[in-house]
From Swiss-Prot:
Residues 169-171 are annotated as: G5. This is Elongation factor Tu. Monomer. Pfam families: GTP_EFTU, GTP_EFTU_D2, GTP_EFTU_D3. Residues 10-201 form the tr-type G domain. The keyword Cytoplasm applies. The gene is tuf1. The keyword Mitochondrion does not apply. It comes from Bartonella henselae (strain ATCC 49882 / DSM 28221 / CCUG 30454 / Houston 1) (Rochalimaea henselae). Its main location: cytoplasm. InterPro entries: EF-Tu_GTP-bd (IPR041709), EF-Tu_GTPase (IPR050055), EFTu-like_2 (IPR004161), EFTU_2 (IPR033720), G_TR_CS (IPR031157), P-loop_NTPase (IPR027417), Small_GTP-bd (IPR005225), T_Tr_GTP-bd_dom (IPR000795). PANTHER family: ELONGATION FACTOR TU, MITOCHONDRIAL, ELONGATION FACTOR TU-RELATED. It catalyses: GTP + H2O = GDP + phosphate + H(+).
């Protein structure tokens, strides 16, 4: 029987499986599709296609499914390096994550690293699936593993005591064995995900922001800036701030056009031209943003989590040290910045992910979770995300 088309009336949420290698992320992903979507077998998911995001090649598998409440897009990555790259580049946005931990092994190094990354890149909520419980006979041992997972989550500032932990076996679900730890556990997991992972605010409901890509002057009409509206709505007659690179200034949008047609407003996702009152061609440049007044501020210093490309990925061939000065590509432009490595980190090798402090030579409209590429002479050598603003 043909599957009915996905109902787009439901709220849409992006999630993904995270956790240590071989703890069962891909098996769980397959099991979820079995009950909530169009079934995808383990090897269909495991053979993930390569994609490029911010100049970086990443293997990611995408599946979709739906519960009674929501429609989900779910990402699963075959290798650990793909997770690191995925989370840092935001290639696959995650509104929440399912952390898969093998009950037989407990938390392992990548369990910890994925939780830390989730914290750094701002994944809002995590639900835990304690997998392979059929391999543990001792109830006390299971309790101990659960406690360990909760402590680890709390250590990285997730509410470890409140996070739902569902115990089950992805394999049992796939093989239609022991229903209580198979199908029932997967159904319980998705009901926890439905209830615990918040529905993200839609981009149109957020405050207006548009990165400026190009500036034109139109004789007799004034200056037009073009770009794709990142979030929010802009209506003709509204006041906006021009932020970044230079001192912040204010102007009024006197016209919005799209495909040469005049509109009364532009909204998230639209490629528009905005006519600005009283701004000359020299008063504004690519790399600045138009934004709702007081919604975003310019900054030069921040902490970042970054992934540095390997030589094979087209990155650097050599390590870098404190005082490294590459370009940081934010939204539409490159800005030079100076890197300070954390204490105890001598150097960063190609292929590493690293927490670092960055000081830009000019301010950029910035907030936490903003992504950037690290470039040298136009060539991407890394990717990062703002984890904390310093000044």
């Amino acid at each position: 029987m043909a599957k009915s088309k996905f109902e787009r009336t439901k709220p849409h949420v992006n999630i993904g499986t995270i956790g240590h290698v071989d703890h069962g992320k891909t098996s769980l992903t397959a099991a979820i599709t079995k009950y909530f979507g169009e079934f995808k077998a383990y090897d269909q998911i495991d053979a993930a296609p390569e994609e490029r995001a911010r100049g970086i090649t990443i293997s990611t598998a995408h599946v979709e499914y739906e519960t009674e409440k929501r429609h989900y897009a779910h990402v699963d990555c075959p290798g650990h390096a793909d997770y690191v790259k995925n989370m840092i580049t935001g290639a696959a946005q995650m509104d929440g994550a399912i952390l898969v931990v093998s009950a037989a092994d407990g938390p392992m190094p990548q369990t910890r690293e994925h939780i830390l990354l989730a914290r750094q890149v701002g994944v809002p909520a995590i639900v835990v699936f304690l997998n392979k419980v059929d391999q543990v006979d001792d109830a006390e041992l299971l309790e101990l593993v659960e406690l360990e997972v909760r402590e680890l989550l709390s250590k990285y500032d997730f509410p470890g005591d409140d996070i739902p932990i569902v115990k089950g076996s992805a394999l049992a679900a796939l093989e239609d064995k022991d229903k209580s730890i198979g199908e029932d556990a997967v159904r319980l997991l998705m009901s926890e995900v439905d209830n615990y992972i918040p529905t993200p605010e839609r981009p149109v409901d957020q405050p207006f922001l548009m990165p400026i890509e190009d500036v034109f002057s139109i004789s007799g009409r004034g200056t037009v800036v073009t770009g794709r509206v990142e979030r929010g709505v802009i209506k003709v007659g509204e006041e906006v701030e021009i932020i970044g690179i230079r001192p912040t200034s204010k102007t009024t949008v006197t016209g919005v056009e799209m495909f040469r047609k005049l509109l009364d407003q532009g909204q998230a996702g639209d490629n528009i031209g905005a006519l600005l009152r009283g701004i000359d061609r020299e008063g504004i440049e690519r790399g600045q943003v138009l934004a709702k007044p007081a919604s975003v501020t310019p900054h030069t210093r921040f902490k970042a989590e970054a992934y540095i490309l390997t030589k094979d990925e087209g990155g650097r061939h050599t390590p870098f040290f404190t005082n490294y000065r590459p370009q940081f590509y934010f939204r539409t432009t490159d800005v030079t910045g100076i890197v300070t490595l954390p204490e105890g980190t001598e150097m960063v090798m190609p292929g590493d992910n690293v927490a670092m402090d960055v000081s830009l030579i000019v301010p950029i409209a910035m907030e936490e979770k903003l992504r950037f590429a690290i470039r040298e002479g136009g060539r991407t050598v890394g990717a990062g995300i703002v984890s904390k603003i310093i000044e």
